[in-house]
Design a protein with these regions (language model features):
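N-terminal capping/small domains of soluble enzymes
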Residues: 1-78
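Hydrophobic faces of well-ordered beta-strands that scaffold small-molecule active sites
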Residues: 8-11, 44-46, 70-75, 95-99, ...
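Ser/Thr-centric signal marking residues that sit
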Residues: 11-12, 172, 287
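Short, small-residue-enriched loops and turns at beta-alpha junctions
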Residues: 15, 19-20, 48-53, 104-106, ...
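Alpha/beta enzyme core
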Residues: 24-41, 64, 79-137, 142-195, ...
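Active-site loop-helix segments enriched in His/Asp/Glu that coordinate
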Residues: 51-91, 115-116, 148-155, 184, ...
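Catalytic alpha/beta core domains of metabolic enzymes, predominantly
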Residues: 176, 185-280, 284
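Single conserved hydrophobic/aromatic residue that forms the stacking wall/gate
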Residues: 281-300
Length: 300
């Protein structure tokens, strides 16, 4: 891949569906996926196959009809999740298994009840298992922006050695700000010996309103895949708005010297389609501020 190309990873059908009050049928997901293909996104995360029969069916349906982009399924670092993800993806022209596990101390203690070495072993084994099914494997250390840096370097290095071709750095709770996120990406690039063997990706949440800015800061630092949702959909206050990220890269090519594969003339039709299917109304700034405030309250 050319070093000036930023890959666009759309997770509207997975993380976007976690927005409050949103649920899509298999047929609606297929309609959105076909429009995302017209838009020119590089990767469509079509769902989380192990989470429900509906997600499994949606992924399978999309793989049968959408052939140009990579189709991904999310999977926890659990053998059965990896197996179910592959079962849903096996007919895809370009399948990707995206596996994740928490990595911050707070998540390890309060959610997983495991120590760092146990988590590292689980991550490596899951990447190795996914690699037996397909060449394209993405790994995400969940809550990476609150993870001890030395441990994060080790975890990333180990999963790349195990076969991960994309390493995604999630700001899971929307905690960071652009300057420190940029620094974290730079530190990863400078301290993980085999980082050149994987594409570095970012996945930013908007709890403090910084998701798009954090994504752009990461791109400036060398990330070459950005994850986000159409219309900034997503859990709590949402994900990075892909429209904002894409148009920043395209409009300010003079600054970044970067491009994407997106057909920008399809951004408006895609946004409208998603809005119409979800019966969304324009979210005013006071409403958005309320959503962000609520998200911050929930995370305390």
């Amino acid at each position: 891949m050319a070093n000036n190309k930023v890959l666009i990873f759309d997770t509207t059908l997975r993380d976007g569906e976690q927005s409050a009050g949103i649920g899509l049928t298999v047929e609606e997901k297929l309609v959105v996926a076909k429009q995302l293909e017209r838009l020119g996104v590089d990767i469509i995360e079509a769902g989380f196959a192990a989470s429900s029969p509906g997600d499994h069916e949606a992924i399978t349906t999309i793989t049968n009809e959408v052939k140009t982009p990579i189709i991904a399924s999310l999977a926890r670092c659990v053998e059965s999740d990896i197996d179910v993800a592959w079962d849903a993806l096996k007919k895809a022209e370009r399948p990707r298994i995206h596996t994740f596990i928490s990595s911050s101390d707070v998540h390890l203690m309060d959610i997983l009840n495991k120590d760092p070495e146990q988590v590292l072993t689980m991550a490596v084994k899951s990447v190795e298992r996914a690699k037996k099914y397909c060449d394209d494997v993405e790994f995400s250390p969940m809550d990476a922006t609150r993870t001890d840096l030395e441990y994060l370097y080790r975890l990333i290095e180990a999963t790349i050695t195990a076969g991960a071709t994309t390493i995604n750095v999630p700001d899971t709770v929307g905690y960071t700000i652009p300057s420190e996120f940029r620094q974290r990406i730079e530190l990863i690039k400078n301290n993980v010996p085999n980082i050149d063997k994987a594409i570095l990706s970012v996945h930013c949440h908007n709890d403090l309103g910084n998701a798009a800015a954090n994504s752009i800061a990461a791109v400036e630092a060398g990330a070459r895949q950005v994850e986000g949702c159409i219309n900034g959909l997503g859990e709590r206050a949402g994900n990075a708005s892909l429209e904002e990220v894409i148009m920043t890269i395209h409009t300010r090519e003079d600054v970044f010297g970067l491009t994407t594969n997106v057909d920008t003339t399809q951004i408006y039709p895609t946004s409208r389609l998603v809005s119409d299917i979800l019966s969304l109304i324009h979210i005013s700034e006071p409403t958005r501020l309320g959503m962000i405030s609520y998200a911050v309250f929930c995370l305390k």
